[in-house]
Amino acid sequence: MEYMINRVNHKNYGWLVDMGNFLCADEDPQHAVGIAAPYAVHAHVKDFIFKKGTEDMPAGRWITTRGGNYIRGTVVGHGVVPVRPCMNILKRAGYNGYVSVEFEGAEDTLAALNQALEYLRRVDA
């Protein structure tokens, strides 16, 4: 991605930093956001529950990661994504744009979004 963004080299071309998606590839979100942050044009925040691939696959809507682990969406702040550190990395890189909440969990959607908003307000304080 860095290579492509640098090759395009246009102010209108950058990185949609989706901090939760890095887990789908078994990448450390904090490290990956650190790489992506200087190129951020928008940010998504979501959270996942994580299970090692050495365990039995849980029942329900789980995603198998590239490395064979299991993740399932949950309320922002309830999972393993280091949201506060990722947000701080984005801020330090100069990102001051919008952050969209993505929710892919099994919990009630409206309740989950309200909890995510409450959590993000505390993180941003």
Describe the role of every protein-language-model region.
Residues 1-125:
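Histidine-acidic metal/acid-base catalytic patches
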